[in-house]
């Protein structure tokens, strides 16, 4: 369970960065006062601070007064942000500062600094009329890490593939006796010795796989591909010696004509289609499980904004499933006469109706305290409700059905909830007076 939770948390981080990239790419400024700064892990904050001080000196010579002041202001903002860090975080640091022009033509200051969800091995400093997000986009493209085990009669190779980066983790050679018809009375003994050596070889591969592909008691790869000539790979996948936690991660067995690095390259080519569909398959499985709950009428499911939020408040939602393009907005409104706060969830077509933003009794317009998309609010708060957040697309058949049929929001519950009974009870305020 813990392993799936980390995958889900990672997917939420990825969604947040995608959203950030979208808003940063759309932003434009006057002049060259928009600074993009990326510091890789193990770099020194002091080096970057010195570089910014030098840049400040250079920028003081810009002829245009307006541009000069805005560039100097942006550099000062970046320097202030850097003072918050004693050292560069383990995954590096990304800073965006500058003055952007909004759709209404007003100027707005933007200061963003964060540590990415995985190491960013890029060093960048640019002053431009836009923010540079290429390095962040690259960070998203190669997210899943896959393990490869290539076995043949001469030895085994262990490697990983992440995006376009392949890495050989370990390899060793073996000297296995070949089959032969000699030996007379000892032929059976020779065959037994041969089988024993094969058995030991498979055991060594299984033990090495645990050392390389399991950290902190959970697999560190999204999936495993077993490759090789002959039937070693099949023997390994069916063997009791192969760790159960890795067994469930096997995506494909592929036949390759070579061992070693050449076999590794061939295995990557042959399994490319399976690897590209992993996210897709996980999503299909998840929504399939959700549909199973509904078809079996277990009562351990919810859909629609209202029911899902009720179940969240009760701490009943185990897995919260939300479509990545859910357009519902969350508003917090305040009535100044009574000091009461009211929370609304509106679709784009409902937002145009201004009666939602006025008090029904007095007709007074309420002040908007907070507004953000419901999905963004979920992404920031789902852990408070003890849930796992899964953000899905509508590209699979199941995903499309989930969006069209269930409004793109739903959840799998820890226990059964009678929503109709709750609605009935809500109408009767005296019901709970005795408790």
From Swiss-Prot:
Q: How does it assemble?
A: Heterodimer of two subunits, one of which binds GTP.
Q: What protein am I looking at?
A: Eukaryotic peptide chain release factor subunit 1
The record's subcellular location field reads: Cytoplasm
The protein's GO terms of the molecular function aspect are: translation release factor activity
Question: Which Gene Ontology cellular component terms are annotated?
Answer: cytoplasm
Q: Which UniProt keywords apply?
A: Cytoplasm, Protein biosynthesis
Q: What does this protein do?
A: Directs the termination of nascent peptide synthesis (translation) in response to the termination codons UAA, UAG and UGA.
Stored InterPro entries? eFR1_2_sf, eRF1_1_Pelota, eRF1_1_sf, eRF1_2, eRF1_3, Peptide_chain-rel_eRF1/aRF1, Ribosomal_eL30-like_sf
The source's domain of life comes to Eukaryota
Q: Which family does it belong to?
A: Belongs to the eukaryotic release factor 1 family.
